[in-house]
Swiss-Prot record:
Residues 563-648 form the S1 motif domain. Residues 651-692 are annotated as: Disordered. 3'-5' exoribonuclease that releases 5'-nucleoside monophosphates and is involved in maturation of structured RNAs. This is Ribonuclease R. It comes from Chlamydia muridarum (strain MoPn / Nigg). Keywords: Cytoplasm, Exonuclease, Hydrolase, Nuclease, RNA-binding.
């Protein structure tokens, strides 16, 4: 009966099909993508221009109208037909002008940062520009916006934007993030004491004498993982990865479990964490602190001297971490700048991680160098420093070991015939890769065409751009051509890692999926297969929400940071690199600030304006991606978080032709170098393929 109705509904308009899904809206540019509810029928996201959102907001459950001609096509561009349910119950607005004591114009980033909306203010209070308000999300109406939408209703006053301490409460409200735990959850967590570890000893492997230790940042509190390294009688590596056994404490359907399932993950802000679990567990009993007994799930993996897996064991254990090491300390040991009782073990671990890294290169895995930074805040929550994060040998060591553990666990559970959550990363669309190839070519780089193109990208990214000033741009553009990694009960492999089996197992303190994977290892019947599908979708969705919340918090803090720069050093010139040029304007990246900016065409010098959209090969050389430019801050408006830039034409600039010729020369040399290296790698990879 239901199917007949659906068919009849489609036939009413033979030109389109209505696809239900979740809408995700770009926070700055305003366009959106709908992730279909039925990925098997529609295995792609549907692009929705800002002009076709029809009043739909980020996170809404919508029906998107997709023309029949595009169902299997390349464009996949749709129009919002209907909002089935709102994703957010509240919005946050900032007053930009007052109409009367009870009516104001507000900027609401979630709806439209460019177009102010009316808001009815609560009485008995004096308001001023910059006041931040909690507003009720408007209901959706057909034919939106056929007339001016009604004023938004104010629910609560949240402070003024001049006070940086209001940023965090605003982000929590905007993204419906709950910080405090319900009393029942706190009580359940507090009932667990150190004696529970002692009581569990009889049913676990006692590894308290094993030399294992944690490696984390200096500020970390929740230690998910510890590592160990020993050898068998043949000299093979035995790598131990020991993960906090959160599943021992958080049992199915308990108050702790239900709350963790709602949160799905911990959310990290500068100087602040919203944990998935109460601190009694996350920072204490589950955290693998040094010199105390802790329950763990230990994975021992035996590797040949060449780094290939020959055996593994998975068991529940009790461990006692011997040291709490920081990344900086481990780096100093690797660089022979620090003597430590475990220096020998760390140096051997570093060698093993390098072997793993080489194997990843051989199979064509893309190693990306993406710009990132840490923002420091003072006691008033004002940003005071922006420090670039660099991936060091210590970071790579832990990354390689965790990748191996996640891969082994995925292989193990899936070969038990158990339905499980995989961490998948599907191959990119060919049209996206084509755009990346064109961008790389315009920057002076060359990618050799082969039947399997992954190694070509890997060698381009690693060899051609290593140490190159355009490295962050090239790598960022490559990431944009990729699909987003997510969770799925269907194993589709991991494109970025070039792995057939991959999951998340190593962070159960901060990720709910990892906790589920732990349960599947020892109590698979405790996870209902039907419920698992819901968990997977919820965790993928909440992961996006967390990323948006973290990004929104960084954006307002960065606006404050740049405003301070503008006030104190208004004449400062910043070196930037062009990303794209269009009739709308010019977008660029500032590596030193880890920031992307945009200058509209109306504010550009004439030589930087194009009237029609041009292919990369048609652009003048001074407009090509990667060309350096100088920019200056023009204005920073906290009310709307708008950051405006001015392009400053440099009097002395080296010829772009010379730079392009040099880049091409470099690319040719790398091409020759990588070609012979690739042949050796492919030969070696084929020889060792049966190692696992």
């Amino acid at each position: 009966m239901g199917k007949a109705k659906n068919k009849k509904k489609v036939l009413k308009n033979k030109q389109q099909v209505l696809v239900p899904g979740i809408l995700f809206v770009h926070p700055k540019k305003g366009f959106g993508f709908v992730s279909p509810d039925q990925p098997d029928l529609y295995p792609f996201d549907i692009f929705v221009p800002a002009s076709d959102l029809k009043g739909a907001l980020d996170g809404d459950h919508v029906l998107v109208a997709l023309p029949f001609s595009q169902r299997g096509g390349e464009k996949r561009k749709g129009v919002i037909h209907k909002v089935l349910s709102r994703g957010k119950t509240v919005l946050v607005g900032t007053i930009i002008s007052l109409i009367s004591p009870t009516l104001a114009m507000v900027c609401v980033n979630a709806i439209s940062p460019e177009v102010p909306l009316k808001a009815e203010l609560l009485p008995k209070r004096t308001y001023k520009i910059g006041d931040r308000l909690l507003l009720k999300t408007p209901g959706w109406k057909e034919n939106y916006p056929s007339k001016e939408p009604p004023p938004l209703a104010m629910l609560e006053f949240m402070g003024n934007i001049s006070n940086a301490k209001t940023d965090f409460p605003v982000i929590k409200a905007e993204f419906s993030i709950t910080e405090e735990f319900p009393e029942a959850v706190v009580q359940e967590a507090s009932q667990f004491l150190q004696k529970h570890v002692t009581q569990a000893l009889h049913s676990r492997k006692d590894l308290r004498d094993l030399l294992c230790f944690t490696i984390d940042s200096a500020s970390a509190k929740d230690f998910d993982d510890a590592v160990s390294l020993t050898y068998d009688h043949e000299g093979n590596y035995i790598l131990g990865v020991h993960i906090a056994d959160v599943s021992h404490y958080v049992t199915p359907n308990s108050a702790l479990d239900q709350e963790a399932a709602k949160r799905c993950n911990s959310i990290y802000f500068p100087g602040k964490v919203i944990p998935m679990l109460p601190s009694a567990l996350s920072d204490n009993l589950c955290s693998l602190k040094p010199n105390v007994d802790r329950l763990a799930v230990s994975v021992f993996m035996t590797f040949s001297k060449e780094g290939f897996l020959s055996d593994y064991r998975i068991l529940r254990s009790v461990i006692r971490s011997k040291y709490r090491m920081t990344y900086d300390e481990v780096d100093e040991i690797i660089e022979k700048k620090l003597a430590h009782p475990i220096s020998k073990t760390i140096l051997e671990m570093a060698e093993l991680s390098r072997i793993f890294s080489d194997i990843r290169e051989q199979r064509g895995c893309t190693r990306l160098v993406l710009p990132s930074f840490t923002m420091s805040l003072d006691n008033l929550q004002e940003p005071v420093a922006l420090v670039e994060n660099k991936q060091t040998a210590a970071h790579k060591l832990i990354e390689e070991f965790m990748l191996k553990a996640n891969e082994v666990i995925a292989y193990h559970i899936s070969h038990q015939g158990i339905t499980m959550p995989f961490r998948i990363h599907e191959p990119p669309n060919e049209e996206n890769l084509l755009l990346f190839r064109e961008t790389a070519k315009a920057m002076g780089f060359t990618i050799t065409q082969t039947p399997t193109q992954e190694p070509d990208y890997q060698y381009l990214l690693q060899e051609t751009s290593a140490g190159h000033p355009l490295e962050p741009i090239l790598h960022s553009q490559f990431v944009r051509s990729m699909k987003t990694a997510s969770y799925s009960t269907e194993n589709k492999g991991h494109y970025g890692l070039c792995l057939d089996y991959y999951t998340h197992f190593t962070s159960p303190i901060r990720r709910y999926v990892d906790l589920i994977v732990h349960r599947l290892l020892f109590h698979p019947l405790s996870v209902e297969e039907g419920h698992l599908e819901q968990i997977v979708r919820a965790c993928s969705s909440q992961e996006r929400v967390a990323a948006k919340a973290e990004g929104a918090f960084i954006n307002i803090k960065k606006a404050r940071f740049l405003k301070k720069f503008l006030d104190e050093q208004p004449a400062t010139l910043y070196k930037a690199f062009i990303i794209t040029v269009s009739p709308e304007g010019l977008s660029f990246v500032l590596p030193e600030l880890c920031h992307e900016g945009f200058i509209p065409a109306a504010k550009l010098p004439k030589k930087y304006v194009i009237k029609t959209k041009l292919g990369l090969e048609e652009l003048p050389e001074h407009l090509l991606p990667g060309i350096p430019i100088s920019v200056q801050l023009a204005s920073v408006t906290l009310l709307t978080q708008a950051i405006e830039w001015t392009l400053i034409e440099s009097k002395e600039r080296s010829s772009s032709k010379k730079k392009k010729a040099k880049a091409k020369s470099n690319a040719t040399q790398v091409k020759k170098k990588s070609s012979s290296k690739k042949k050796k790698a492919v030969s070696k990879a084929k020889k060792n393929r049966g190692g696992k």
